[in-house]
Amino acid sequence: MPLNVSFASRNYDLDYDSVQPYFYCDEEENFYHQQQQSELQPPAPSEDIWKKFELLPTPPLSPSRRSGLCSPSYVAAFASFSPRDDDDGGGGSFSSADQLEMVTELLGGDMVNQSFICDPDDETFIKNIIIQDCMWSGFSAAAKLVSEKLASYQAARKDGGSRSPARGHSACSTSSLYLQDLSAAASECIDPSVVFPYPLNDSSSPKPCASPDSTAFSPSSDSLLSSAASSPRASPEPLVLHEETPPTTSSDSEEEQEDEEEIDVVSVEKRQPPAKRSESGSPSAGSHSKPPHSPLVLKRCHVSTHQHNYAAPPSTRKDYPPTKRAKLDSGRVLKQISNNRKCASPRSSDTEENDKRRTHNVLERQRRNELKRSFFALRDQIPELENNEKAPKVVILKKATAYILAIQAEEQKLISEKDLLRKRREQLKHKLEQLRNSCA
């Protein structure tokens, strides 16, 4: 049966409304072509409102970067999906228009992120990741679309069986003509060394960045293209999904956006299995002049965008500035260090505390005994409480105060009497002297 490129009818215009706008300024577009063909239900009122006001799409879209599709791995992948001849038992062949439709379906337009199916050796792979608008959450849906297309193509390829090298070479040449026009956008890419001073991939040996004009087709890519077209074994392994990391789905990305406020991005890493290395090191691999083609492994990584949800209520949690937070952390560390120093010798500290408590108890007992004896002595000096052994301390203090005041008053009275008596004595002495002088 011939290779069927068409998929189930899905309204991708509604699924990818963040990527494709509903209308263009000063241009009449058929926005509801599926509705006119199948006479489905009328469009949503939101779409009529957008069409009524004819607003420009915001935010603006980024320029399309399709130079990554010209990599040898992608050309080899397309060569593996080439149609069969009538004599191979396939049931028919495709014309040039069908091949063009296949390429258009495989490319997927702006709905497919080109960083999924490009070769990591190509310099435009890094540029695609840098320039692609990841804030509109188009990666998860694009990854799902690519996985569905590749699964259908691989199923059709397995049903088709083996293909002739001549037919694969013609398909590669045709696809290279279609893909060569896409390399013009590579000159408009930004050099990743300007944006990221450090390398983005985990390769041990850094590779010098090539000029944007030379990233479309290099001599190494031409040799890989010719070898991929001539060798029938190079076609079945252009793109391999890692077993530990399943392809990203839209539900997974939505959950991770709600929990971690991060967007999933699929990065391509080049890995060579040990079986391939053993085959390349064996002498039987001398017949093949090219090195074994390394599979592409899709892995998931997280790119933090730090998006702010303006619709959410203001948080009541107080965020400290970095300097104040550093001071608080340093204070906590110092407090922990002081506590550790205090608890360095627990036995010695316990003995010291027991000794201090014992001496304190002894001194407190002595103080209480002295105070009790003082109250007893004061009670004995008061005539009213002299024989009252159960007199409280308050009564002792009050009676002692009254007794002291009475004694002070009596003292003042006695002092005044003493002064009068002294004066009387002086007068009597003076009178005695006068009498002695008169008698003489």
Curated annotation (Swiss-Prot):
- Tell me which PROSITE patterns the record gives: BHLH (PS50888)
In terms of Gene3D superfamilies, this protein maps to:
Helix-loop-helix DNA-binding domain
Pfam families named in the record: HLH (PF00010), Myc-LZ (PF02344), Myc_N (PF01056)
Domain of life the protein comes from: Eukaryota
Q: Does the keyword DNA damage apply?
A: no
Q: Which positions are glycosylated?
A: T58
Instruction: Spell out the Low complexity composition-biased ranges.
Output: 210-239, 280-289
Q: Where in the numbering of this chain does the bHLH domain appear?
A: 355-407
Q: PTM N6-acetyllysine: list the residues.
A: K144, K149, K158, K276, K318, K324, K372
Q: What InterPro entries does the record tag this protein with?
A: bHLH_dom (IPR011598), HLH_DNA-bd_sf (IPR036638), Myc-LZ (IPR003327), Myc_transcription_factors (IPR050433), Tscrpt_reg_Myc (IPR002418), Tscrpt_reg_Myc_N (IPR012682)
Q: Give the residue interval(s) assigned to the motif UBR5-degron.
A: 356-365
Residue positions of motif 9aaTAD: 101-109
Task: Name the residue ranges with Basic and acidic residues bias.
Answer: 267-279, 316-332
Record-level GO cellular component terms: cytoplasm; nucleolus; nucleoplasm
Q: Which GO annotations describe the biological process of this protein?
A: chromatin remodeling; chromosome organization; DNA damage response; G1/S transition of mitotic cell cycle; intracellular iron ion homeostasis; MAPK cascade; negative regulation of cell division; negative regulation of monocyte differentiation
Q: Give the primary localization class.
A: nucleus
Glycyl lysine isopeptide (Lys-Gly) (interchain with G-Cter in SUMO2) cross-link, chain position(s):
K52, K144, K149, K299
- Chain intervals with Polar residues compositional bias: 336-348
Tell me the segments the record calls region Leucine-zipper: 414-435
Name of the protein described by the UniProt record: Myc proto-oncogene protein
Query: What organism does this protein naturally occur in?
Result: Pteropus hypomelanus (Island flying fox)
The gene name reads MYC
